[in-house]
Amino acid sequence: MEELSLENPFDPENAEAVSVKESPEMLYDQMLTRGEELLQKPLRGGGESRVRVQHSKGRMTVWERIKVLTSSEPHITFQNWGSELDGAGIVTGILNIDGRDVAVYGHDFTVRAGSMDATNGGKIARQILMAGEHGIPLIGMNDSAGAYVPAGVGGLDGYSEAFAAMRKISGVVPSIMLMFGYNAGGGAYLPRQGAFVIQPEDTFFGLTGPNVVREALGENISADDLGGPKVHSKSGVVDLIAPDELGALRSAMRLLSYLPDNNHSTPPVRSTSLTLDDYVEEEAILLHKTFTNPVSGFNTPFDMRLFLQQLVDYGDYFEIQQVRAKQLTTAFGRMGGNVVGFIANNSAYASGNIDTEASRKGAKFIRFCNLYNIPVIFLEDVSGYAPGSEQERAGVVQAGRELLDAIVDLRVPRLTLIVRNAFGGAYCAWNSYHVGGDFVFALPSARIAVMGPAGRQFVYKDEFREILQKYQQDLDSGTAEHDAAVVRDTAMVKLTARYERELLNPEEALRLGSVSRIVMPGHSRKVLGNTLCYLLRHYQPSAMGGPQRE
């Protein structure tokens, strides 16, 4: 046992003895060395062998992913870990991405497969809450085997703490979640609480993996068919897919460029040399070619994304949920440097009819824009909601109500341009003046009515009845059925043309004030862009009253 000394170490006579043992300078150097070790320990992760395994799977380490997001030195927060590596599987930090502060968390799969314990859950929760308190966006890089089994209930508590934190910042700051590797259980729930989820190819996430499904249900299914990007992109569980991890990270950075820091601010305005006042000849050519098609004419399927391309700066837009419900396009773009959320009917798919999936897709996008002060432009070409027993069983009435509610609740600047069809209840709900639209414009090709061409039999009842009676009389008099049908169909075509000429146009809507003005082809960008600038000059960004979630 070491003897205790009662000598004063600061006595000049004892100075030599102190220096021989451990001088204050030596102790300080030791502290610096230990501090450097602690600082560098997270960077080493699970060691070189674990890193090689990660690379052999075609996956980056969490530190390599961070380097893709920023060229600046990351400010790492919450470096804590326990004696049993508790907490070491999570990296948290603040990154400078294009001059903006962004909170980031990422699983380090080289340490205990990025599994969740109580310490990890606390680290993630603190990082998430800090993003909300400081009003900065959050990016999550998920690559975890799930709860750490030896941690017992501590791993589950870790997820619970992170779940609660994610819910608290929902609607306060935007969040982007990236799915790397294989994530199950809580590792699937947590990222889906985010505003946007991006999943690259050759990854999986779901409630349970294929082995559990096989044991529980006897169903043999691959991980890709159970929880791969093709499955989740169609259902709307993921918002974007990418070919690989690098593509996913770049998509996250591009998406971030359209998003504000928080619900009190507006998205970044990007300076541009483009003017909003130019005539866009490509738009006029596109509409002319579409609506003068010699075969289908005004019934030509029209991919609205081609039209959207003529409106946005440099023809560049960023589509969200591109695979799900293709008859409805949701995208971010810029006009005059200002970020806009576009929601457009796309008759190139399912005739543009709004079904259950399209309603929920649109409602989610509109709610997000409303929360984060992003103006919305509706491009309308809709003949109605999808009919049929299948849609009724799927809950189209409830889903349609969700879409309608989201549109009515909009408090951000919102415009509508009727490109072609605007029929019935779909017209009523699609940001008309009477549900709160700031301005409603129409191209000369707009057809606004209670019903489409089928409405001829209700407007021209006598003429319609006479055509059918003439057909029956011809048959009774011995006219061949084919010849009688030709006469009938020719008369019906003329009656339809009359209906379209007299009623399927914007004139009545313009007279009633349901449309504020006609926009000529080639001038849509000018009218929409300048009107948007006017509205934004008088819009004060703010959070919505009360707790509002995404």
Where are each of the predicted segments found?
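Ligand-binding clefts of soluble mixed alpha/beta catalytic domains
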Residues: M1-E550
